Amino acid sequence: MKKAGIIGYGRFGRVLADLLSKKYAVRVYDIEKVADDEGVEICSLDEVLECILVFIVVPIRAFEQVVKEIATYTLY
């Protein structure tokens, strides 16, 4: 099964994970410790960035910092 990654697991991230889990294995990264939900694997940022799709769903105040951080990774 193809993997989709979500950075940020707040309200919007949870809704997105629920929708994606119907067709993808969903990996989630959040700076806060979060519990595993059914159909979601809590992972490191490295593991999420290995996914074929990655969604950034963080608060707007954190968006720029997250983009700068993931820009240092080698992505597809």
Regions found by a protein language model. Give the residues of each.
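Active-site regions of enzymes building and remodeling cell-envelope glycoconjugates
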Residues: 36-45, 74-76
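Rossmann-like NAD(P)-binding element
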Residues: 45-74
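Short, Lys/Arg-enriched, disordered terminal segments
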Residues: 1-3, 45
